[in-house]
Amino acid sequence: MNYSELYKNEPVYIKDSTYDADWAVWKDGHTIYVRFEGTKSFKDACMDLLAFQSKIKAYDGATWDAHAGFKTAYYSVRNKVLDTCYNLYEEGDKFMVLGHSLGGAMALLATEDIGWHFKQKLTLITWGAPRVAKDQNGIDAIKEYMNEDSRNFENGSDIVPTLPWWFATNPMVVHIGEAKYSNAKALKDVLFNGCKKYHCGYGNQDLYSSIA
């Protein structure tokens, strides 16, 4: 099915019935937004817990180890997401990929995919995203398609960005993208008002207080 044919002028919102992976794609001006939702169901939690390693072959030919659950969740919707992006894309369009928690992990995996298919670096914004790549090849594959505006927001008291702890084989594996730490009030403000007031949460640095 050509999913975007259903929503020529509306956001495309699809829920995967197999792994409960939720995503949405919409276009505003010359920017295409791709958003993945976080953990909210038993199926989502099962994907979080599948923390063994699974191989991914990057577009540059390198092979890297990824979190098996996050890979499974993303691959269940991958073709639909790319199909929708292709149908919305016009020459000159840019991409912003967004995700919270489990959705942040899926956004990380989508970054290499979308960047390679559309031959551009994109803006990646994650909130409370867990670790996805086990090795440097994975880090490099994803970072190759991230532009300088990419950000990784974390609540300093949130344990999720530190998991799975055994994926931290070197400092580069801990975070992909520039980390911004926030207190709970600031994070709530960004999550509820960020896309409207703060251009998806990375435009106003005064919101964030470093607690590292």
Feature names for model-found ranges:
Residues Y13-D60:
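Short, surface-exposed "cap/lid" segments of acyl-processing enzymes
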Residues S101-M106:
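Active-site loop->helix "elbow" adjoining a glycine-rich segment at hydrolase catalytic centers
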Residues M1-S17:
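Extended, Lys/Arg-enriched charged tracts that mediate electrostatic binding to polyanionic substrates
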Residues Y3-S4, D22, H30-T31, K57-D60, ...:
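Serine hydrolase/lipase
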